Amino acid sequence: MADEKNKSQNPDLEQRDINNPRDREALNRAADDFLKARKAEARAEVAEDEAEAAVDETANRIAMLEADNGELKDQLLRAAAEMENLRKRTQRDVQDARTYAVTNFARDMLSVSDNLRRALDAIPADALATDASLKSLADGVEMTERAMLQALERHGVKKLEPEGEKFDPNFHQAMFEVPNPDLPNNTVVQVVQDGYAIGDRVLRPAMVGVSKGGPKATADNGASEGNG
């Protein structure tokens, strides 16, 4: 292309005589011009290649930075989620520590309350009716028991009242069964010893009696008899 272009610009070069100084000088100038043009074209091609390489390198760099940015963003989101989970877990642990801090103490106090109640129940009713000092002492013991239970309640200890409810092995301890065809099976019909809970946890299960032979049991028995 460059040779054809040079020939088109200098159509008489081939007519020059190299032995003629003037023609030889013209040929030298033409050769210099040709070389300069080729060098300029080469530099332009190199510059274009370098520009393309720079563009490719920049594009690759941008792609790498975008990938790094995505990875860092993902790491940041995971770290934020972990921090939030840690905050919630710590908050829950602190709340549990506050709620259940008195668990062992409360359990011991319930034993004391049980002893006070047994002492009161051991006093004959006729003795209370005839002995004023004994009656006064019994009233004092009862007030002490009541105040103790109220103090425990202020610290999150609640009395379980399961009578009439379905038996729950997490909060109740079955001591005996009571035949009762009018109630569904495993209904709490009697509380032998009060149970207590603190927060969502059982502090002491209620000792109870549960019904047996209710409607469901009767239906089952009927089915068994029919099969027999």
Curated annotation (Swiss-Prot):
Q: Name one GO cellular component term.
A: cytoplasm
**What are this entry's molecular-function GO terms?**
adenyl-nucleotide exchange factor activity; protein homodimerization activity; protein-folding chaperone binding; unfolded protein binding
State the compartments where it is located: Cytoplasm
Cross-referenced CDD domains: GrpE
Residue ranges the record marks as coiled coil: none
Q: Where is this region: Disordered?
A: 1-31, 209-228
One GO BP: protein folding
Keywords for the protein's UniProt record, in alphabetical order:
Chaperone, Cytoplasm, Stress response
- A Pfam family annotated for this chain is GrpE
InterPro entries in the cross-refs: GrpE, GrpE_coiled_coil, GrpE_head
NCBIfam families referenced in this protein's UniProt entry, alphabetically: PRK14139.1, PRK14140.1, PRK14141.1, PRK14150.1
What the protein does?
Answer: Participates actively in the response to hyperosmotic and heat shock by preventing the aggregation of stress-denatured proteins, in association with DnaK and GrpE. It is the nucleotide exchange factor for DnaK and may function as a thermosensor. Unfolded proteins bind initially to DnaJ; upon interaction with the DnaJ-bound protein, DnaK hydrolyzes its bound ATP, resulting in the formation of a stable complex. GrpE releases ADP from DnaK; ATP binding to DnaK triggers the release of the substrate protein, thus completing the reaction cycle.
Quaternary data? Homodimer.
Q: Which family does it belong to?
A: Belongs to the GrpE family.
Q: What is this protein called?
A: Protein GrpE
Organism, scientific name = Brucella anthropi (strain ATCC 49188 / DSM 6882 / CCUG 24695 / JCM 21032 / LMG 3331 / NBRC 15819 / NCTC 12168 / Alc 37)
